[in-house]
UniProtKB/Swiss-Prot annotation:
It catalyses: pyridoxamine 5'-phosphate + O2 + H2O = pyridoxal 5'-phosphate + H2O2 + NH4(+); pyridoxine 5'-phosphate + O2 = pyridoxal 5'-phosphate + H2O2. The lineage of its organism: Bacteria, Pseudomonadati, Pseudomonadota, Gammaproteobacteria, Oceanospirillales. Its EC number is 1.4.3.5. NCBIfam families: pdxH, PRK05679.1. Binds 1 FMN per subunit. This is Pyridoxine/pyridoxamine 5'-phosphate oxidase. One of its GO terms (molecular function) is FMN binding.
Length: 212
């Protein structure tokens, strides 16, 4: 397999300082809405979440952005998962959004804080019934002997909750990543990409252009 000749040119318009909102959350929402409107045949809310455990070993996975407010970026997960265990040991995380057909990326660094039970419950009850059941059936990140065992656990929980509301599991919840830095990347010709980094100060955000 020869990989070194695989390359493409970036053709979209660039990004200048005057195009940027002073608040990176506003700027993020603008780009996210553009990605949604573009109908990229991919989930525009998908983000790579990178965590590091107490031994300094990194791991990452794709999760979905489920809310965004001035305080940060929200996602949900099993609280016994590897990501949750990593966050308990080291709350510093990174998020990465890649909208490659638009030649855009966003990188976020920040601190993950667990959501309240009330906030997690509100979201959990809005999920499709079978997604709620699946949350009960899976002991995320734990080993299992076969797919059949997982499907059996799902059917058992499906039968358990066939009538009435599915409650929030005690082992399921969410996190809000409170951003410290947010970088916006726009591809440009000749690899002279546009990069702007927002850095949190006491009350505002500083914006700096970075070299590609």
């Amino acid at each position: 397999m020869k990989l070194d000749d695989i390359r493409r040119e970036y053709l979209y318009a660039g990004l200048s300082r005057k195009d940027l909102a002073d608040d990176p959350i506003v700027q993020f929402k603008n780009w996210l809405q553009t990605a949604i409107d573009a109908d990229l045949n991919a989930d525009p809310t998908a983000m790579s979440l990178a965590t590091v455990n107490a031994q300094g070993v990194p791991s990452q996975r794709i999760v979905l952005l489920k809310n965004l407010d001035p305080s940060g970026f929200v996602f949900y997960t099993n609280l016994g998962s590897r990501k949750a265990q990593n966050i308990a040991e080291n709350a510093n995380v990174s998020l990465h959004f890649a909208w490659l057909p638009m030649e855009r990326q966003i990188c976020v660094t920040g601190v993950a804080e667990k959501l309240s039970i009330a906030e997690a419950t509100r979201y959990f009850l809005s999920r499709p019934h079978e997604s709620q059941v699946a949350a009960w059936a899976s002991q995320q990140s734990q080993g299992i002997g076969s797919r059949k065992l997982l499907e059996q656990a799902f059917e058992q929980m499906k039968n358990r909750f066939k009538q009435g509301e599915v409650p929030l599991p005690s082992f399921w919840g969410g996190y809000r990543v409170k951003p410290v830095t947010i970088e916006f990347w726009q591809g440009r010709a000749n690899r002279l990409h546009d990069r702007f980094l927002y850095k949190k100060t006491d009350e505002n955000w500083e914006i700096e252009r970075l070299q590609p």
